[in-house]
Swiss-Prot record:
GO cellular component, one term: cytoplasm
Transferase in keyword set: yes
Species in which this protein is naturally found: Synechocystis sp. (strain ATCC 27184 / PCC 6803 / Kazusa)
Molecular function GO terms recorded: DNA binding; DNA-directed RNA polymerase activity; protein dimerization activity
Catalysed reactions listed for this entry: RNA(n) + a ribonucleoside 5'-triphosphate = RNA(n+1) + diphosphate
Protein name from the UniProt record: DNA-directed RNA polymerase subunit alpha
Gene: rpoA
Region of interest: Alpha C-terminal domain (alpha-CTD): 243-314
SUPFAM superfamilies in alphabetical order: C-terminal domain of RNA polymerase alpha subunit (SSF47789), Insert subdomain of RNA polymerase alpha subunit (SSF56553), RBP11-like subunits of RNA polymerase (SSF55257)
Domain of life the protein comes from: Bacteria
Length: 314
């Protein structure tokens, strides 16, 4: 089996602790660069687990459109700032973080009290600004998940009162690009070089993300290795599919009226038509005797297929 090499050719930490790395994978057979690159990109962006704030509770607040005395931001703005909070959770169980801040001053993520199972990635992340004498008391729930969770209600009925749900972004990988280059090694036939650029929010290193994505893809295909058993179980079965049944109804060259009626009835191919008897055709809305005769004649002349006159008896 041909082996390819993986090399990290560039790596850096950017603002807000965001991580970036560039990887090179080579040599790959022609066409495999696009196949591997596309699969990795989709899994990196959609299937890796991450942590996010899913709900908050602020003292004296019972809806997201409220304001807090002495706090520059209203509750909705605070919720948006909490949505952008980058966290890492080492447990699958929901965790509760807390904040008690008294003005004047700026509130950042560094002031949060979080369990040992939760890590705040960027302590400088801005939350709110408090005036003299203002007080902000808050609890927030941290959960692990995959992808993006959209709330359906303003309150979390499964939790304590006054907890306000937040649209949660769990995706630790923020951006992925890939390019495929042509290479020639030792005078051999042309090969592919896959260049993969990965950006993360800082809760995971790009090399860790690439490793996890590769595991997910590999595990996805493991069941396909046992197809021999499937073949043995079905060795005596012959699935006889008439290729003519897969022909779209456009090939029958019907009149516009008959064609539109069939389309509205979700009849898109000859296979769909074969589920109907001649009586069934007449029951289609706006499908008269003339249209039915046209379809029956087209099937007979073009494909040698004759529809049964009556519905099959149960």
């Amino acid at each position: 089996m041909a082996q390819f090499q993986i090399e990290c050719v560039e790596s850096s930490t950017r603002k807000n602790q965001q991580q970036y790395s560039k990887f090179s994978l080579e040599p790959l057979d022609r066409g495999q660069g696009t196949t591997v690159g596309n699969a990795l990109r989709r899994v990196l962006l959609s299937n890796l687990p991450g942590a996010a704030v899913t709900a908050i509770r602020i003292a004296g607040v019972n809806h997201e459109f409220a304001t807090i005395l002495g706090v520059r931001e209203d509750v909705l703005e605070i919720m948006l700032n909490m949505k952008e909070l980058v966290l890492k959770s080492y447990t699958d169980q929901p965790q509760i973080g807390r904040l008690t801040a008294i003005g004047p001053g700026t509130v950042t993520a560094a002031q949060f009290e979080v369990p040992s199972e939760v890590e705040v990635i960027d302590p400088n992340q801005y939350i709110a600004t408090l005036a003299e004498g203002a007080k902000l008391e808050m609890e927030f729930r941290v959960e692990r998940g995959v992808g993006y969770r959209v709330i359906e209600r303003g309150k979390d009925e499964n939790s304590s009162l006054d907890f306000l749900q937040i649209d949660s972004v769990f995706m630790p990988v923020t951006k992925v690009n890939y390019t495929v280059e042509d290479i020639r090694a030792d005078g051999m036939s042309p090969k592919d070089r896959l260049i993969l650029d990965i950006w993360t929010n800082g809760s995971i290193q790009p090399r860790e993300a690439l490793s996890e994505a590769s595991d997910i893809i590999a595990n996805l295909f493991i069941p396909l290795k046992d197809l021999n058993e499937l073949e043995a179980a079905h060795s005596d079965y012959q699935d006889e599919v008439n290729p003519e049944s897969q022909i779209p109804i456009e090939e029958l060259q019907l009149s516009v009226r008959a064609y539109n009626c069939l389309k509205r009835a979700q009849i898109n191919s000859v296979a769909d038509l074969l589920e109907y008897s001649q009586e069934d055709l007449l029951e289609i809305k706006n499908f008269g005797l003339k249209s039915a005769e046209e379809v029956i004649e087209a099937l007979q002349k073009r494909l040698g297929i004759t529809l049964p006159h009556e519905k099959a008896k149960a």
